[in-house]
UniProtKB/Swiss-Prot annotation:
One of its GO terms (cellular component) is ribonucleoprotein complex. It comes from Mycoplasma capricolum subsp. capricolum (strain California kid / ATCC 27343 / NCTC 10154). Part of the 50S ribosomal subunit. GO terms for biological process: translation. Residues 50-83 are annotated as: Disordered. Belongs to the universal ribosomal protein uL4 family. GO terms for molecular function: rRNA binding; structural constituent of ribosome. This is Large ribosomal subunit protein uL4.
């Protein structure tokens, strides 16, 4: 397929030929779902911890005799029904939340989301950013020129470009990453994908 490449003023300056295998497939919803779940699960740190009845402080003896008091029988003040007692089936840090997805499914999900951006006209390719210094004002102007200033946008450059990152940091709803950091969740979380020509080629080389 061929798509237009714009300059930062919003002018069409040339066409770029992109591989249909990466940018033009029918989106596979299950692959997308599985990959997002896997990515989110990997972020869970598993740092929550509560004490069981074996770990809380308190005596192990019976608080009162079994019969004759008129009260319900109790075995220990560390039992879960007591205030300050242990927690039953509480969270522990040894739980492995990881959900594995094989490379083929992950790649299919990636191509599916990229194709979805093209299909929904939410992909904008720019030739390059040419900031002389960090400038939020200039980035806002660029986004207005590209008609994406009111959209949640993911900006992707081939390498990390500090001037682009610093220029977009203070703009609500805008995130900037390099091509090797691109992931399915960030793509789905943004309405518009603003990618440089170099970054688009780099992404295609990985997934073609």
């Amino acid at each position: 397929m061929k798509l237009q490449v714009l300059d930062t003023k919003g002018n069409e300056i040339k066409e770029i030929a992109l591989n249909d295998y990466v940018w033009g497939i029918e989106p596979h919803q299950q692959a997308i779902y599985d990959t997002v779940i896997s990515q989110q699960a990997a972020l869970r740190q598993g740092t929550k911890k509560v004490k069981t009845r074996a770990e809380v402080s308190g005596g192990g003896r019976k608080p009162w005799k079994q019969k004759g008091t008129g009260r319900a029988r109790q075995g220990s003040i560390r039992a879960p029904q007591w205030k300050g007692g242990g927690v039953t089936f509480g969270p522990t840090p040894d739980i492995n939340y990881k959900k594995s997805v094989n490379k083929k499914v992950r790649a299919l999900a990636f191509r599916s989301v990229l194709s979805l951006k093209v299909k929904e006209n939410n992909l904008v390719i720019v030739d390059k950013f040419d900031f002389a210094k960090p400038s939020t004002k200039e980035m806002v102007v660029v986004m207005k020129n590209l008609k994406i200033d009111d959209q949640k946008t993911l900006i992707v450059t081939k390498e990390k470009e500090e001037l682009v990152v610093k220029s977009s940091n203070n703009i609500t709803g805008v995130k900037t990453i390099s091509a090797n950091q691109l992931n399915v969740f960030d793509l789905l979380n943004a309405t518009k994908l603003l990618i440089t020509e170099e970054a688009a080629i780099a992404v295609e080389e990985v997934y073609a």
